[in-house]
Amino acid sequence: MKATDLLAMFSLSVVLSACGGVQAGGNVQSGVQAMLAGNNQTALSYFQAAAQQDPTYIYNAQLQLGVMSYLGRAQYLTGNYAQAVQTLEQARVQNSGDNLAQLYLGLSQARLGNQQAGLQNIAASMKQIMVWLNFLNGNYPGQGWDPDGAIQSRIQNAQAMMSSGNVEWYRLFADGEAVGLGVAQQEQTFRQLNIDAT
């Protein structure tokens, strides 16, 4: 094989892989919009397509949130808890600091009956999300991160209940889901503000 043939094949593979990333990005963006609109089955389809195109695709570069994190969240929101656990564990391997993946992992584990592991992951993720929100609000006031305190209030309610030892699971699920979707909405709002500013 000639050097020019090898170069042509390499160039083609680079172009095709770039196209996969662009397609994955478009599918993740559409999936996020569907998820935030409550169209979880549609969101799941978009995230599945993105994961097939590029399972390592990072949608939110600042927070390093990958497609597997979004896919796992959509699996949880559509009741596919066992699949969600597998996908979210994979997302946590890709980014151990993905607090939303850890939150939904804990919610999925608890829904499957592994309440001890679920509670540990829910508590740890909520603690880190609260630290993150406090950091953002302290260092970037007026940027719109949880302006009415709804996310922080849900976290505080959940933390108080978990520390009491008297966990009402239906309330913890509701609080956890509200925190997860609230953070996702805030991320999308902030992302859009940054896009509009450029």
What are these regions (language model features)?
Residues 132-198:
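Terminal, low-structured helical/coil segments at or just beyond the last alpha-helical repeat
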Residues 63-64, 70, 104, 138:
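Canonical tetratricopeptide repeat
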Residues 16-37:
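Bacterial Sec signal peptide processing site at the extreme N-terminus
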Residues 51, 107-134:
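TPR/TPR-like (Sel1-like) alpha-helical repeat modules
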